[in-house]
């Protein structure tokens, strides 16, 4: 029994210790790529996206459309680089909350429906990245190591 449990639990645990960098990297690359291009598309089609924001009842659409588009583009870029990861993931998470409330909330009739939205899945991933951080394979990692070696500010 011990051998079976070691094979089913212990061995995968030992292997995964060497791959802790892969989860955050894969998550950052996946959503970073999606939002880099989503933001780019919105930035290059602001009039149409602004009309969509008006139709969804989002206040100040002429301000929030370029702001949201920029958050998506630069947030995606920063996630790809692993730079300012927690801030970028937090900003993109807030964007997903607004997207759900503004464009999808009327379609929610159950928890299953809410959890099935792409925006909710992105929100979960952004929350994880904001809490867990970018991982070792990121630009944030050497900056964090450098900051740790600096004397405390007066």
Please report, for each region that a protein language model flagged, where it lies by residue:
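Extended, low-polarity transmembrane helix blocks
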Residues: 1-44, 62-70, 74-154
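Short juxtamembrane and helix-loop transition motifs at transmembrane-helix boundaries
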Residues: 46-58, 86
């Amino acid at each position: 029994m011990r051998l079976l449990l070691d094979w089913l639990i212990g061995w995968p645990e030992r292997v995964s210790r060497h791959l802790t960098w892969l989860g955050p990297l894969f998550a950052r690359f996946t959503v970073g790529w999606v939002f880099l291009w989503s933001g780019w598309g919105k930035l290059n089609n602001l009039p149409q996206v602004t009309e969509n924001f008006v139709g969804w009842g989002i206040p100040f659409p002429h301000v929030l459309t370029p702001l949201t588009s920029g958050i998506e583009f630069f947030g995606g870029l920063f996630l790809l680089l692993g730079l300012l990861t927690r801030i970028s993931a937090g900003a993109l998470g807030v964007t997903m909350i607004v997207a759900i409330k503004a464009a999808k909330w009327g379609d929610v009739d159950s928890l299953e429906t809410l959890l099935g939205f792409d925006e909710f899945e992105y929100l979960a991933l952004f929350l994880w990245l904001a809490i867990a951080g970018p991982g070792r394979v990121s630009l944030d990692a050497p900056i964090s190591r450098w900051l740790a070696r600096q004397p405390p500010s007066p």
